[in-house]
Design a protein with these regions (language model features):
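Short, hinge-like loop/turn segments at secondary-structure boundaries
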Residues: 50-54, 83-84, 124-125
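Short secondary-structure transition/capping segments
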Residues: 48, 78, 120-123
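Acidic, PIN/NYN-like endoribonuclease modules and their adjacent C-terminal/linker elements
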Residues: 1, 98-125
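Short, well-structured N-terminal submotif of metal-dependent ribonuclease cores
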Residues: 1-35, 44-58
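Structured helix-beta-strand junction loops
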Residues: 30-31, 59-62, 86, 104, ...
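Active-site neighborhoods of divalent-metal-dependent phosphate/nucleic-acid chemistry enzymes
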Residues: 19, 64-111
Length: 125
């Protein structure tokens, strides 16, 4: 299973010709795609039109949901501090998603450059 970040989900859901969208399609078809509640919040926040709403609602019952539990929040807090100490400025939502992946020992599928800065710090915790 692989935790898919919002950036890659958007590529897939909007049908863009991209490597990230192709990777997500493979994960979805193989049953290996997962998301967390933070990703869902971001997706619902950016959904456009009736078609996207319908697709996302249908997918919610099909895609594995990785819990954002107490361990994730504790790790996210540590990761936020580590980012601050290293001068890395990234959205809080990306910190939570990275912490979710790290806490559950899942690789993260993304096409968001913020994770190139966050993930090495998460692995060091």
């Amino acid at each position: 299973m692989k935790l898919v970040d919002t950036s890659s989900w958007v590529e897939y859901l909007r049908g863009r010709e991209s490597e990230a969208g192709d990777r997500v399609e493979v994960l979805v078809l193989s049953g290996e795609a997962a998301w967390c509640d933070m990703t869902l919040v971001e997706l619902w926040h950016g959904v456009r039109g009736v078609k996207e709403k319908r697709e996302l609602a249908e997918m919610e019952s099909e895609i594995e949901r990785v819990p954002v539990n107490e361990a994730v929040w504790r790790l996210a807090s540590k990761l936020a501090l580590r980012c601050r100490e290293k001068g890395v400025t990234v959205p809080t939502s990306d910190i939570v998603i990275a912490a979710c992946g790290a806490a559950h020992k899942l690789e993260l599928e993304h096409c968001d450059g913020h994770f190139d800065d966050i993930l090495p710090l998460a692995k060091a915790l």
